[in-house]
């Protein structure tokens, strides 16, 4: 190769190299463009996947007693859940039929709240909503609204709409009703690719196995573990613990008076199918008990294939709520209340009207903690769902929270409040007296009476409390007026909320603003009658305030909030002073002296000889019902605190149709015995005390009512009628119809 040819070859090589470099540069620039500029778009086009996020429900926190013993807890259950994302193009109604048949074969039910019966022999449907059930009637109205029907629509109209909407005409009538109900439930639960449908809840392990065996023919049908509320001590404090339940349509979608619709629970992070506290402490402490839900992410590609499943957020359980109540003591008070009512019926109430209901509340005097809140009759939390109809139909009202919401005339238990008002205001002192001859004659034509049991003549305040002298309190009450003694009673805890965390009745103190007010009401209200009504928990709070010399604490059920994993205290309830009566001089000491002498006046009761001093006051208010002309049925009321000189607990008791308040004396002793047994470690888990009960501690079954007056201090007017005073009760003149009448 000559020199010229060599140069030509080199030039050609350089051109080829340059061309190759330019080509490589162009490819490089294109690659950069594809990867850096549009990389995400092309990656998405290449993979074409979609993420679906599903909620993993967190376990609800426990409710435990003061020792940490579980009362309410969460246990693992199993739900049958439909996942639309995984169902693909499967025939939905055909699949629903398969699931229903499997559930039926295992004795299971499924979610169906459609208030319509199965068709009768001629193919007609009827509504199953109970006429007297507000809940059912609201659900029925909501169902018609949801389906776009008028409120006058019949059950047949509703089924016709469901059959049309969900193309069910080809199915037999019974299947139309079954499938229509499930479709309606799906509508309520907003079933979609991102909202699973809970078809059946808390199914058995046998059902779980059956569903899994048929999994290949049931795509999208899953068994999902869930937390179910269970009450390990299901008869302990059921009225206060409250219940949990599904979020109702009314709570999920709220429309105000202006037609503005909001979803407050959704804004707080709830899903429509979530379980929420709906009453009692379960509701009051919802934010603490509710855990933080987790998130499961399912990734599906463009062909519909699941390519990844991951728990992207781990659920966190709710906090533990610890109560002030020791479940052993609560059981002991429950038992004592039931036995006291039984004793009253065996020994005293042998007529047609039996003592059938009552309540007892026990507080820690030092800080207002509730130690027991008993209702009789009561119910079992774990049976509530299955026996609701029986419970709600029971005339003795076992579902009614008498301890917190029952309103009762306090009778003579109100007298210490009047004594505090009179002493503290300076109207009287320890030497002041009122003459009692059994009749109060200040008013012309109206002469209310006193039993004069154990006393007569000039009576001072201590004696008046001991023997419950009506005339003393008539006169003092008239001179004070209800304006003054009501103000003191209010500060002592009567006629107002106690501060507990759950719903409670307010009550009422007789006032000049009452529609039936007349001057004589001031003397009636001074002995705890007139229009005055209070709750048992107010009576206990009142007794605790007397024991604390006028300092009233907020009454409360919750001791602390605990971390459910470590048990560490997150927050603790501190004693909170709600009101103080400073108390001039020896005001509260004089009232204490009178109250600690009351047990000695109660004959035929363990309270009269109890070795620890008890300060108490009984009440025997008349009810409006009569068992004979002029003879009214009576309630039994008691307030007490003990030990009298160094108070630890305060008690409030009411027993409907219990007769004299003195009949609750044994109940006070039984509560005291259980309390001290709890303190010294001899109180058993079932509420019984370690040592065997002796014969002296119980009332023989064949015992008859004593001939003597049980407590003259409290005897009703019909047992001490003075012929000179006439036979007309003041209560019959002034008490509104249907309200408890007076006891004199």
Model-derived features: positions:
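Conserved SxxK-family serine transpeptidase/carboxypeptidase catalytic domain
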Residues: 194-215, 224-235, 239, 243, ...
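Amphipathic, well-packed alpha-helical segments that form the structural scaffold of globular domains
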Residues: 286, 290-293, 303-304, 334-342, ...
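Beta-lactam-recognizing serine transpeptidase/beta-lactamase-like catalytic domain environment
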Residues: 72-73, 78, 299-316, 325, ...
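Membrane-proximal periplasmic segments of bacterial cell-envelope enzymes
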Residues: 1-314, 350-359, 714, 718, ...
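Structural motif corresponding to the C-terminal cap of alpha-helices
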Residues: 336-348, 426, 599
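Transmembrane helix-loop junctions in multipass membrane proteins, especially transporters and channels
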Residues: 38-42, 381, 678, 682
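Solvent-exposed, polar/charged alpha-helical surfaces in well-ordered, non-transmembrane soluble domains
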Residues: 90-101, 209, 213, 238-242, ...
